[in-house]
């Protein structure tokens, strides 16, 4: 696979697809969009799918990226449809050149929406999704995707007894526990009662009960 890297005047960001021993990861202006240290991007996506448990029906993938999570979800026979949303057209352009993202554009169970998840989620009906995967960029890059307003929308579009995987990463010392506490506090304010941390996936599993 030839190296993919470029600067976008429209976004003012540098984009780079970085090879690993398995699936490549995306880097935007020096910030990795995938875990690539203790686990590779392929294993990272697999751990997220494992953490959310048995999935079926219709699934929302809030931030497409290179499409790895959407692809693994759509591979499951119990999943009927994966709706995945990506704001950055440059990311989709890179995904189209990444052979490991090919099923994102070829699997008929995957519906890709080019748009802002913060706005697109408002267009879905109440209790539309059985499961949601929310893997946003860092909070300082996309703070609106960690907001109470967005969490209320997640609650609204999720079916009763549905689950959400919310990737939170491993916050630095300066953020510390207050970062996770803030997320959990806003999720509870949005209506979610059952929230647990799954360390191996660096994610919260949230149930609507």
Question: What spans do the regions from the language model cover?
Answer:
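N-terminal auxiliary segments of SAM/dcSAM-dependent transferases
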Residues: 1-19
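Conserved alpha-helix/loop element of class I SAM-dependent methyltransferases that forms part
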Residues: 39-57
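Conserved class I S-adenosyl-L-methionine
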Residues: 55-66, 83
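Conserved SAM-binding loop of SAM-dependent methyltransferases across substrates and taxa
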Residues: 66-79
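S-adenosyl-L-methionine
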Residues: 87-126
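A short SAM/SAH-binding and catalytic strip from SAM-dependent methyltransferases
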Residues: 130-145
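A short glycine-rich, Lys/Arg-flanked "PGG" loop and its adjoining helix->strand segment in the class I
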Residues: 146-163
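Class I S-adenosyl-L-methionine
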Residues: 170-209
């Amino acid at each position: 696979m030839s190296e993919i890297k470029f600067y976008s005047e429209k976004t003012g960001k540098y984009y780079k697809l970085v090879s690993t021993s398995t699936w490549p990861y995306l880097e935007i202006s020096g910030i990795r969009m995938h875990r690539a240290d203790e686990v590779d991007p392929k294993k990272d996506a697999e751990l997220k799918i494992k953490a959310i448990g048995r999935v079926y029906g219709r699934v929302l993938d809030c931030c497409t990226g290179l499409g790895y999570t959407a692809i693994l979800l759509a591979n499951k026979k119990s999943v009927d449809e994966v709706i995945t949303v990506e704001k950055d057209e440059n990311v989709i352009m890179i995904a189209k050149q990444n052979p490991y993202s090919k099923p994102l554009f070829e699997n008929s169970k995957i519906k890709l929406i080019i748009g802002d998840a913060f706005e697109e989620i408002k267009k879905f009906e109440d209790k539309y999704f059985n499961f949601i995967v929310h893997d946003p960029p860092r909070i300082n890059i996309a703070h609106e995707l960690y907001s109470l307003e967005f969490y209320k929308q997640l609650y609204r579009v999720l079916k009763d007894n549905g689950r959400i995987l919310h990737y939170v990463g491993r916050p630095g010392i300066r953020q510390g526990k207050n970062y996770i506490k803030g997320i959990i506090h806003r999720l509870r304010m949005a209506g979610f009662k059952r929230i647990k941390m799954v360390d191996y996936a660096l994610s919260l599993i949230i149930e609507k009960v």
